[in-house]
Amino acid sequence: MNGTEGPNFYVPFSNKTGVVRSPFEYPQYYLAEPWQFSMLAAYMFLLIVLGFPINFLTLYVTVQHKKLRTPLNYILLNLAVADLFMVFGGFTTTLYTSLHGYFVFGPTGCNLEGFFATLGGEIALWSLVVLAIERYVVVCKPMSNFRFGENHAIMGVAFTWVMALACAAPPLVGWSRYIPEGMQCSCGIDYYTLKPEVNNESFVIYMFVVHFTIPMIVIFFCYGQLVFTVKEAAAQQQESATTQKAEKEVTRMVIIMVIAFLICWVPYASVAFYIFTHQGSNFGPIFMTLPAFFAKSSSIYNPVIYIMMNKQFRNCMLTTLCCGKNPLGDDEASTTGSKTETSQVAPA
């Protein structure tokens, strides 16, 4: 084995020289230089400084402006809540541990940090699944006279939390476990060992199949059908130009969110899968640290995409920030905002 396994950790460093110490008790400077730990801390500080204000602002602006409280926006707000979970439950912890060079909060703190990070990532993933299904139903019209209303949005939000908890909670109750990963300053699912005592192998397989592969299949199916339908409708001019433009704008925004999610999380998932399927292989701490910390940047991109691509929300945000006046003088809802207030499908 090219790593060192302890009762509640796995350090990707051979202990032939006897230098490996518990990541809960001693600095891990034999894994990387102190300045590299400082760089991780600086990166986490940047994510906190950017992630908290922009996600909090998303929630606050929506509460302040009634016209933003639409069914589709419930799902988008759910993403902001998930991102705040990651900021408070994960980023602040990792910032502190990186400054110390090891996970100073012990196994209990590791469980909490790993839980919040996993929960936030999974809520984001399943929110994108719900958005993909909503876009598919609204644009592709597989059901006639269907109206995506408030109750559907609430059920969609509840579904994302149930599925996220089904992934994040089991390691807390004995099915798999959370351990420090990479440079041992943040925690995640144990992809490094089989650990039969906690049935780790079965959980990792379950996680990759149910909480990554299936959501990706659903998302790609929905958007594959959606692209085909939009092209067909444009060719046949089945919808008004205003309706087509509005639906295209919303669809484009959601697709960009999916692409951004894939860019952030696929490297992490790929490295984790490689480590799990190549038990005992030789890899350094940076190998897992870089994709893990890159994935954490997902807490920033969703609200940025939403603000940049939703004119109605952008106007409301500027009005809120400028004490009730929009400096751009454009305070009317865009076609996207008015169209998505209640998504409706008429008979094809």
UniProtKB/Swiss-Prot annotation:
Annotated positions of the Phosphothreonine modification: 335-336, 340, 342
Region feature (Interaction with SAG): 330-348
Glycosylated sites: 2, 15
Keyword annotations of the record: Acetylation, Cell projection, Chromophore, Disulfide bond, G-protein coupled receptor, Glycoprotein, Lipoprotein, Membrane, Metal-binding, Palmitate, Phosphoprotein, Photoreceptor protein, Receptor, Retinal protein, Sensory transduction, Transducer, Transmembrane, Transmembrane helix, Vision, Zinc
Disulfide bonds: 110-187
Topological domains annotated Extracellular: 1-36, 97-110, 174-202, 275-286
One GO-annotated biological process of the protein: visual perception
Chief location: membrane
Motif annotated as 'Ionic lock' involved in activated form stabilization, chain positions: 134-136
Binding site for Zn(2+): 201, 279
GO cellular component: membrane; photoreceptor disc membrane; photoreceptor inner segment membrane; photoreceptor outer segment; photoreceptor outer segment membrane; plasma membrane
Location of this chain's protein in the cell: Membrane; Cell projection, Cilium, Photoreceptor outer segment
Quaternary structure and partners: Homodimer. May form a complex composed of RHO, GRK1 and RCVRN in a Ca(2+)-dependent manner; RCVRN prevents the interaction between GRK1 and RHO. Interacts with GRK1. Interacts (phosphorylated form) with SAG. Interacts with GNAT1. Interacts with GNAT3. SAG and G-proteins compete for a common binding site. Interacts with PRCD; the interaction promotes PRCD stability. Forms a complex with ASAP1 and ARF4. Forms a complex with ASAP1, RAB11A, Rabin8/RAB3IP, ARF4 and RAB11FIP3; the complex regulates Golgi-to-cilia rhodopsin/RHO transport in photoreceptors.
Protein name per the record: Rhodopsin
Membrane topology field: Multi-pass membrane protein
Lipidation (S-palmitoyl cysteine): 322-323
Record bears the keyword Lipoprotein: yes
Keyword Iron carried by entry: no
